């Protein structure tokens, strides 16, 4: 797919330089707040091991497991690869259906390596399904094809009478009316983005600020660690900022290898994102993380990781950027593929969870033992982390020794009734977690 870039003239001067020339520990120790010391192992280029999970699907009647006091039910099924979930202002639920599209050569290689068994394959559905629960019983009584003919969509946003959809190659707007079950108007592309990306870095997410005056777009890298040349990473590994009409594009934050989930911490103006860090430095490097994002901030990729730890593959190339690298807020485990992100704003969950953060961890492949494959929770109070990360929704791993999994969680979203929805792309399911 053709890559379209905007001129450097659109970028703030503080970041033009960043992009023109383009930072032994157990997994359980990688969930501390980084206000504490995080002891990382030395990078080892020879220690990297691949272990792809094998998806076997959920047996009839079996569900993921939530803590005591919660119920888990199937909200929707038999839909191909639900990756993201967006709850409309009127309570309708949009499920974004999309998956990686592989060339014939890639498909053959993935069969040989075992990767094909761990992901949703074939042609992407490239569609959005609408669900409506009219009688509020936790089960949708209406399902409608809301929008189709998209290009690997992921992010959705509604501002007034405008629907925004982030395809892999750009942001498109459509006329929208509250209560509509199908989009019939023609789309208008308002922002071009570089398409595709390394591994599964084709997702583009969207979020607006409180007064809807700015929109933020997450864009992942085109490589693991810049191995294809930084000239191929323009507008990548960033969170971009635009006006609602697509104008005024700037790079809001850079050096974020693959930022996917984005959310505002309740009661604050802090934008948080979930970031997938780099591969092939060993089982316990580099920790994925969630972090609040500072305007103009640089978070290391590809030169440094988790603060000013220089990547040996980029040694000596940009010591200035290594020095400028910010330390992320919360480590969430290496290779966990932490993608989904949502803060809980409701009152139906116990007080412990109110205001807290939920993280959809899609699960590892570049690690000798599986990590992730769960929804994690981080308690927050007054918009700040108030305790260590803990498991919330588990049971996705069927057999750790055989690396068999029932499913893989991705997007997370809170419904208007205070329940939590979890997209499980490889099992074609959306789960609903509700307090008893």
Where are these regions (language model features)?
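A short loop-to-beta-strand structural motif that recurs across blades of beta-propeller domains
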Residues: 116, 126-129, 170-172, 238-240, ...
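Residue position within the beta-strands of beta-propeller blades
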Residues: 94-96, 165-166, 216-218, 272-275, ...
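Asp-box/WD-like beta-propeller blade repeats and closely related beta-sheet repeat scaffolds
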Residues: 139-162, 167-209
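A detector of repeated loop/turn-to-beta-strand junctions in beta-rich toroidal repeat architectures
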Residues: 124-127, 140, 168, 184, ...
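Beta-rich, blade/repeat-based domains predominating
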Residues: 79-90, 148-162, 196-214, 254-270, ...
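Short loop/turn segments immediately following the C-termini of beta-strands
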Residues: 90, 98-100, 168-170, 176, ...
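Blade-level signature of beta-propeller repeat domains, shared across WD40, Kelch, NHL, RCC1
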Residues: 413-436
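Beta-propeller domain segments
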Residues: 28-67, 104-105, 203, 221-227, ...
């Amino acid at each position: 797919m053709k890559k379209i870039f905007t001129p450097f003239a659109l970028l703030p001067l503080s970041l033009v330089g960043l992009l023109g020339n383009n930072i032994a520990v157990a997994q359980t120790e990688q969930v501390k707040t980084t206000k504490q010391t995080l002891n990382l192992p030395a990078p080892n280029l020879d220690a990297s091991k691949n272990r792809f999970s094998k998806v076997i699907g959920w047996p009839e009647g079996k569900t993921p497991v939530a803590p005591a006091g919660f119920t888990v039910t199937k909200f929707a099924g038999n839909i191909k690869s639900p990756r993201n979930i967006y709850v409309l202002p009127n309570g309708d639920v949009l499920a974004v259906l999309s998956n990686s599209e592989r060339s014939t050569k890639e498909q053959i290689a993935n069969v040989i390596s075992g990767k094909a068994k761990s992901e949703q394959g074939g042609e992407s559905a490239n569609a959005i399904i609408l669900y409506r629960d009219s009688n509020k019983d936790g089960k949708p009584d209406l399902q409608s094809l809301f929008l189709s003919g998209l290009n690997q969509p992921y992010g959705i946003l509604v501002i007034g009478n405008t629907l925004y959809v982030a395809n892999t190659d750009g942001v498109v707007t459509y006329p929208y009316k509250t209560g509509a079950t199908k989009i019939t108007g023609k789309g208008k592309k308002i922002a071009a983005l570089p398409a595709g990306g390394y591994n599964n870095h084709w997702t583009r997410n969207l979020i607006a600020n409180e007064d809807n005056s700015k929109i933020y777009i997450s864009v992942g890298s085109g490589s693991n660690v810049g191995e294809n040349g930084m000239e191929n990473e323009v507008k990548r590994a960033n969170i971009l900022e635009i006006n609602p009409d697509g104008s005024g594009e700037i790079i809001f934050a850079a050096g974020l290898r693959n930022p996917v989930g984005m959310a505002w911490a309740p009661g604050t103006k802090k934008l948080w994102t979930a970031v997938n860090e780099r591969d092939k430095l060993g089982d316990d490097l580099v920790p994925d993380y969630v972090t609040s994002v500072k305007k103009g901030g640089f978070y290391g990729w590809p030169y440094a990781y988790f603060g000013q730890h220089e990547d040996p593959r980029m040694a000596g190339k940009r010591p200035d950027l290594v020095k400028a690298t910010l330390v992320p807020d919360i480590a969430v485990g290496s290779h966990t593929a932490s993608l989904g992100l949502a803060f809980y704003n409701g009152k139906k969950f116990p007080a412990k969870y109110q205001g807290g953060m939920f993280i959809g961890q899609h699960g590892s492949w570049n690690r000798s033992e599986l990590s992730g494959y769960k929804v994690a929770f981080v308690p927050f109070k007054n918009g700040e982390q108030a305790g260590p990360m803990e498991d919330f929704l588990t049971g996705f791993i069927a057999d750790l020794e055989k690396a068999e999994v029932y499913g893989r969680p991705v997007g997370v979203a809170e419904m208007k009734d205070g329940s939590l929805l979890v997209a499980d792309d490889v099992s074609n399911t959306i789960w609903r977690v509700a307090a008893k």
